[in-house]
Design a protein with these regions (language model features):
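Active-site loop of short-chain dehydrogenase/reductase
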Residues: 3-4, 53-54, 81-82, 130-142
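Conserved glycine-rich cofactor-binding loop
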Residues: 12-14
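Conserved glycine-rich Rossmann-like NAD(P)H-binding loop of the short-chain dehydrogenase/reductase
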Residues: 26-43
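The beta1-alpha1 cofactor-binding region of Rossmann-like NAD(H)/NADP(H)-dependent oxidoreductases
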Residues: 38, 59-71, 105
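Conserved NAD(P)H cofactor-binding loop of Rossmann-fold oxidoreductase domains
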Residues: 88-96
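Substrate-binding pocket helix/loop in short-chain dehydrogenase/reductase
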Residues: 96-100, 104-109
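Single conserved hydrophobic/aromatic residue that forms the stacking wall/gate
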Residues: 144-152
């Protein structure tokens, strides 16, 4: 069976985990990425495998161009296609609005690289494969959240 394939960044917990399980229930194969919580991502992969999905788990950092390329390349190497990209990886620093000094320039840059540049790079690396899919879709979930922080 030629199952559809999705990459889900930030798939080790929360929205990413929920999307992974939902797609596995619907018969998708999945590349699941995490930046550091490999054990949690592997647990999500096992849940998806138990639902019939094939999975590929990668430690990746969407703020790193090379890691974005490697994620897409590994997905294509495994399944020779890509149908959906779920940009869910996100980063923040919880800081009260009235405390601007609580957020460093380095914090801001890292947040921006992950939450804005990361989805762009994943889309850029995925585009040529997504254009070949009759069901292609791209979603960016993290940027839709409203968080009580000062970085935006």
């Amino acid at each position: 069976m030629n199952k559809p394939v999705a990459i889900i960044t930030g798939a080790s917990r929360g929205v990413g985990k929920a999307v992974a399980i939902m797609l596995a229930e619907k018969g998708w194969n999945l590349t699941l990425t995490c930046s550091s919580s490999l054990k949690e991502a592997e647990k999500v992969a096992k849940e998806c495998n138990d639902l019939g999905a094939e999975t590929l788990v990668l430690v990746s950092d969407v703020s790193n161009d090379l890691k974005c390329r490697e994620t897409v390349d590994a997905t294509i190497e495994k399944w020779n296609k890509l149908d959906t990209l779920i940009n869910n990886a996100g980063r923040t620093v919880f800081n009260a609005h009235e405390n601007m000094s609580g957020l460093t320039t380095e914090d801001f840059v890292e947040i921006y690289k992950t939450n804005t540049v990361g989805p762009y790079m994943m889309i850029k690396e995925s585009e040529k494969y997504l254009r070949k899919s009759p069901i292609a879709s791209v979603a960016v979930s993290y940027t839709h959240l409203t968080l009580p922080t000062t970085e935006y």
